[in-house]
Amino acid sequence: MDGPSRTLNVALVGPAGSGKTTLFESLAYIAGAVPRRGRANEGFVVGDPSPEAKARQMTTEVTAAHVVHDDVELTLLDTPGAVELVQEGRNVLPGVDLAIVVVEPVGERMVAAAPFLHLLDALDIPHVVFINKMDRSDQRYRDLLESIRMVSARPVVPHQYAIGRGESLVGYVDLLTEQAYQYQPGKASSAMAVPEDHREREQQARAEMLETLADFDDDLLEAL
């Protein structure tokens, strides 16, 4: 049996408290690398096992998980976000292929992500921004994007658009494929049609994405 077609090293970086380790645990669980998903208040399965990490309920050293997804072998690296520990994460960045910058959905706190974004730019490491805890957010998605743009030296291109119902987050739209997905507790998301009351905003978000891409990547724009 053939092995994975390629391998990638992916680092999760971002401010302390943004939920990197919980996301790290979720990714490992969804990929089938661990039998259950750990949480900060219950103990992590693959996250930092040190006594200090358990006492502080935060990552204090880099931890790794190896998963295979869609014929790609991934080494996921969870890095500390606390200011006094951030050098731990910096030490591994030169060896990664991609970074995921995890942030909270609070515009006023987005400035805490600026040092991570600037460092990734300096090291020329491709990166995406993952807005975590959207189910707890009371801020508009567009306002959050503007907050990210204020601290990023690179153009910010939205990839997914959140779908809300009242105070609940029920799904998202992939702006590349224009396919909507509905969240299913404890299960994979299921495909659904873009809700009528979100169609105009989805089209606006997609147009904004294409307009941004047109400014700096014609080849990618044509592919879409």
Label each residue range with its predicted role.
Residues M1-R90, P94-V103, E200:
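P-loop NTPase switch module centered on the Walker A-proximal segment
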Residues M1-S18, A28, R36-R37, E104-L224:
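P-loop NTPase catalytic nucleotide-binding module
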